[in-house]
């Protein structure tokens, strides 16, 4: 049966290859989380021979796969649009969703390719800070940022009490009135001078602009002045008015409770603190350690009595004892002993045996004897035992049975031996040698059989061990 050539799954000549690259920052879909961040870019197949022939025209004779012509082209050359001669058979919806490659007939979604239209500025450049002059900024702010602000101009300076001046109401201008809400009193509304009906005040305004009638905006303003709420907190150096939330009755009560609680932790109220177990290291030559030792020695010196300050014991019967001692004279023998060498702490501790210290007496070890060699044999002298049997060898010889020793071969030959005795002695020697040969042959055969048996057991053991390996 003839072998049929199998059609390849991918035809290399008609196949289209792609490069998987990151999506461009100027692509509008780069900020879309649902769109893939990597796209496919089709590779451009160029014939190597044609490319090399084109390179030779421009004087490039390198024989490698690199395209040197890309450096010779103009970066922004003229572009020409050539319309397609074959009309598209796909609908507009199909063009948006898929991309068709006629060489393979494979349809891929458009989301896996880069967008056709790109923005002029990428996402990273949009997020970068803008440098240069900003025309949309206030000129005064720009001048202050550029250090062109005139601090010597009195109009640019603020008064020390600008907060108080800003909080004082003026007669000719409109005044903002604050009205507490019925629920919690923290809602305020802006009211004009003419809208007196909205605030519920019944008193008329005076000509001088003085608002003193009960229920008037002036009286409402006095209840909520800024400097009345300026109260420092014990917990921080900031005031309560620096809080974002306006302080109503409940918040004020909450603040007062906190202030009362923190009064217990003032410097004058804090008592002795608990002793904390601190661990650490300190240098031996530290000044702090030296001060502590000096204080300790001073305290001990005050509580102890020195020997040179001892006073004699005052006896009450001193007068009577002096009379008796004057009558009796005693001879006292004073023995002066030589001062012994005292042991210090280090020498005492050195007598204790531990893992690293093994105290013992230092002994004088004599030098080993020098080894002398024999001039004849080269063997060390006085090393090998002397000739003759040792005591152990003599004891072993006595334990040997005399029947096991050869009889004829060890018997001395007498000088007065006759021919018959000589013939009998030689015949006995022959018989003894014959028995010795038989015994030697039997021993050799026994050793040979034992060697075979042991080799067979060793082979079986080796096979069993190899069979147990995993």
From Swiss-Prot:
UniProt KW Kinase keyword: no
Coiled coil: 414-470
Any Pfam family matching the protein: LTV
Residue ranges, compositional bias (Basic and acidic residues): 414-437
Listed Acidic residues bias regions: 176-195
Gene Ontology, cellular component aspect: cytosol; nucleoplasm; nucleus; preribosome, small subunit precursor
Chain segments carrying region Disordered: 23-54, 75-103, 166-209, 399-437
Record flagged with keyword Coiled coil: yes
Compositionally biased tracts (Polar residues): 83-92, 399-413
InterPro entries named in the record: Ltv1
Phosphoserine modified-residue sites: 17, 24, 243, 326, 403
One GO process term, biological-process aspect: ribosome biogenesis
UniProt keyword annotations, A-Z: Coiled coil, Phosphoprotein, Ribosome biogenesis
Family membership: Belongs to the LTV1 family.
Protein task: Essential for ribosome biogenesis.
PANTHER family (UniProt xref): LOW-TEMPERATURE VIABILITY PROTEIN LTV1-RELATED (PTHR21531), PROTEIN LTV1 HOMOLOG (PTHR21531:SF0)
Name listed for the protein in its UniProt record: Protein LTV1 homolog
Source species of the chain: Rattus norvegicus
Gene expressing this chain: Ltv1
């Amino acid at each position: 049966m003839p072998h049929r050539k199998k059609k390849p799954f991918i035809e290399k000549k008609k196949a289209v290859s792609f490069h998987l690259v990151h999506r461009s920052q100027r692509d509008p879909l780069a900020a879309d989380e649902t769109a893939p961040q990597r796209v496919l870019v089709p590779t451009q197949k160029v014939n190597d021979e044609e490319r090399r022939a084109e390179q030779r025209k421009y004087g490039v004779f390198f024989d490698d796969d690199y395209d040197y012509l890309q450096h010779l082209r103009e970066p922004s050359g003229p572009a020409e649009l050539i319309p397609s001669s074959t009309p598209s058979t796909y609908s507009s919806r199909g063009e948006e969703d898929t991309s068709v490659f006629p060489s393979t007939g494979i349809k891929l979604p458009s989301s896996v390719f880069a967008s056709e239209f790109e923005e002029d500025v990428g996402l990273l450049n949009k997020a970068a800070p803008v440098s240069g002059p900003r025309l949309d900024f206030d000129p005064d702010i720009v001048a202050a940022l550029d250090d062109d602000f005139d601090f010597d101009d009195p109009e640019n300076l603020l008064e020390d009490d600008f907060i108080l001046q800003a909080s004082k109401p003026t007669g000719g201008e409109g005044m903002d009135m604050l009205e507490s809400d019925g629920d919690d009193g923290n809602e305020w509304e802006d009211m004009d001078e003419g809208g007196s009906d909205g605030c519920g005040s019944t008193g008329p305004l005076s000509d001088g602009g003085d608002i003193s009638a009960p229920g008037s905006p002036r009286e409402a303003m006095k209840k909520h002045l800024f400097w009345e709420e300026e109260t420092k907190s014990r917990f921080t150096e900031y005031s309560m008015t620096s809080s974002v939330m306006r302080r109503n009755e409940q918040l004020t009560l909450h603040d007062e409770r906190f202030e009362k609680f923190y009064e217990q932790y003032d410097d004058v109220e804090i008592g002795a603190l608990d002793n904390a177990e601190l661990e650490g290291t300190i240098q031996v030559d530290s000044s702090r350690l030296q001060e502590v030792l000096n204080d300790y020695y001073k305290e001990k010196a005050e509580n102890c009595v020195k020997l040179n300050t001892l006073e004699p014991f005052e006896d009450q019967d001193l007068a009577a004892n002096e009379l008796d001692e004057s009558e009796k004279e005693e001879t006292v023998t004073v023995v002066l002993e030589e001062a012994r060498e005292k042991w210090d702490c280090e020498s005492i501790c050195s007598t204790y045996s531990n893992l690293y210290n093994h105290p013992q007496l230092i002994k004088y070890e004599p030098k080993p004897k020098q080894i002398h060699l024999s001039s004849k044999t080269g063997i060390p002298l006085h090393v090998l035992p002397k000739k003759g049997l040792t005591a152990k060898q003599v004891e072993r010889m006595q334990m040997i049975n005399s029947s096991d020793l050869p009889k004829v071969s060890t018997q001395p030959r007498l000088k007065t031996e006759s021919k018959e005795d000589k013939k009998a002695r030689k015949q006995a020697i022959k018989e003894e040698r014959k028995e010795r040969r038989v015994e030697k042959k039997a021993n050799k055969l026994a050793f040979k059989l034992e060697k075979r048996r042991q080799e067979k057991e060793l082979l079986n053991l080796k096979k069993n061990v190899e069979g147990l390996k995993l």
